[in-house]
Regions:
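Surface "functional belts" at beta-alpha junctions
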Residues: 1-90, 104, 118
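Acyltransferase
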Residues: 83-135
Length: 135
């Protein structure tokens, strides 16, 4: 959410580099006062994301370090603009803007209610399991 809040396009796709030839992706639409998630976050290849992007009729802003890493996959798609390198990572400014918009709507969350979203197991956990299972 933090990366895409800074942009003014109506439809935004966030593609963060997930390593292993994959991207962490999420789709958003800009709405008055903030952004609206169109699709939940997932893990996919750049080719899978490109195929999904082609199903939309609107112009799309593609942001994130994964979008830049696999730019050659997306450059041939019509209606897709890649955000520049300086905007590839979340910014504190965008986080404050999102938090302010929620605070104005009195949408408060207690710190202990925040939960991270894990789309897959971390490499270290997978490597540990693989190493222990091979013994």
């Amino acid at each position: 959410n933090l990366i895409i809040f800074s942009f003014f396009a109506l439809f935004i796709v966030s593609g963060m580099d997930a390593r292993r030839g994959e991207l962490f992706t999420a789709l958003f639409r800009r709405v008055p006062g903030g952004i609206q998630r169109v699709r939940d976050a997932n893990v996919c290849t750049a080719e899978d994301l490109a195929a999904e992007i082609q199903t939309f009729d609107e112009s799309i802003l593609l942001v994130g370090d994964g979008a830049l890493r696999y730019a050659e996959v997306f450059e041939s798609l019509g209606r897709v603009e890649l955000a520049e390198q300086g905007l590839a990572h979340p910014s504190a400014r965008a986080m404050v803007q999102l938090a302010h918009a929620r605070a104005m709507r009195e949408e408060f969350v207690q710190p202990w209610d925040l939960e991270p979203i894990y789309l897959r197991k971390p490499d270290a956990e997978i490597n540990w399991s693989t190493r222990n299972n091979s013994k």
